[in-house]
């Protein structure tokens, strides 16, 4: 397992560290933990996995070492 930092793309601040196999699964874990409603999309952008929601929130998963 690797550790991924979930970054708020609006403020560019790290929110949490999530252990996962890849960035997509880290964002899925983050979504299940913190986002209870709304529509969302997880896609790859510039080599990083990004989660965007209908509320205008954008998060990305970056592998930490």
Residues of each region from the PLM?
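Short aromatic-glycine-(Arg/Gly/Cys) micro-motifs in beta-strand/loop hairpins
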Residues: 1-14
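Non-membrane alpha-helical secondary structure
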Residues: 19, 26, 53-54
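Short, mixed-charge low-complexity intrinsically disordered segments
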Residues: 33-65
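A short local loop/turn or secondary-structure capping micro-motif enriched for an aromatic residue
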Residues: 23-26, 59
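Generic structural signal for short, flexible, solvent-exposed coil/loop and linker residues
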Residues: 6-9, 23, 48
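A short, exposed loop/beta-hairpin motif centered on an aromatic-Gly-Thr core
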Residues: 12-22
């Amino acid at each position: 397992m690797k550790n991924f930092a979930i970054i708020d793309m609006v403020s560019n601040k790290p929110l949490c560290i999530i252990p996962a196999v890849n960035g997509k699964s880290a964002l899925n874990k983050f979504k299940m933990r913190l986002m209870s409603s709304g529509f969302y999309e997880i896609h790859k952008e510039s080599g990083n996995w990004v989660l965007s929601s209908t509320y205008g929130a954008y998060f990305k998963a970056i592998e930490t070492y």
